[in-house]
Amino acid sequence: MSVVSKNSYILFLFLLVLFFASCKSKKNLHKQNPVASVDTTVEKCHMEFKTGKALSKRMYDNELDFTYASAKFSCELTIDGDEKSFNVSVRCRKDSVIWLSISKLGIDAARVLITKDTVKFTLGLTEKKYFTGDFSYINQMLHADLDYDMLQALLFGNSSAFYDDDSKLKPGRDRNTCQYFLSTIRKNQLKRINSGQEPAGESYQTINLDPVTFKIIALDFTDIHAKRKFSASYTDFKSVDKYLAPFKLLYNITAEKNIKADIEYSKININEQQSFPFKIPASYERIQFKK
């Protein structure tokens, strides 16, 4: 990187946490993590979904749906033991634009504007810098496969299509917690991989669903070739209009750097029209990243 401040690097790592959580994989998937509370009506963990497509549909039917959304959250970001805390305001027009205002100690530190085609941000305070590019540029930088839909889904606890054909996904259910999960490998193979009895492929991941609400409660992704691991958990679900949304999100990345993001929403509102103010002052200096 050149002409890059520490704050701009941290902002990119923060976006990396958000993006990497939804990484697409056309390979295999991984195991379950947190324990969800199980309704007393779910007794024997009966597997009533015979196909991944059927279970995926139930998951999609219970996702947060909106035209506009706005939210506020606090974030504790830890990078190799170095902690940073900040607050974020989010505005979104579904499938169109995401706007982020990042502040520290009540002072506007950064603005981010993301569309299907562009990624822009400005750094305020003493930085007075800006970046403008697109997903192909960021994908090349981060060696990832990112897009707008992934970030939008992640911010609101929804799914992002991680496999081209839902009919090829394998459904499963944990006998202890009754959690459902979706994987591209079968349950017995997943157990052998987790126990070390069978080597994993190039990558594998899992989506875990609450057995009552069918909301996503955990994600796991391991990229063997790149030596990267990602895990996410979603808790503290609250009503947002007629939907449920997680108000606490925890992300962990193990790669060249160990990154943890602990996010807690204070509010989420939907279907109130939003504006997306974004301006690059003429005096700001453009940030240049080496490819």
Residue ranges and their predicted role:
Residues K24-Q32, K168-I287:
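Gly/Pro-enriched, hydrophobic low-complexity segments
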Residues F19-S22:
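C-terminal motif of bacterial Sec signal peptides marking the signal peptidase cleavage site
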Residues K24-D82, Q288-K291:
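N-terminal leader/targeting segments and the immediate start of mature chains
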Residues M141-G172:
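C-terminal low-complexity, charged extensions that often adopt amphipathic alpha-helices
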Residues V97-M150:
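An acidic-aromatic
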Residues M1-L11:
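Bacterial N-terminal signal peptides that target proteins for export
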Residues I79-E83, I102-R111, I224-K229, T254-N258:
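Solvent-exposed loop/turn segments connecting transmembrane beta-strands
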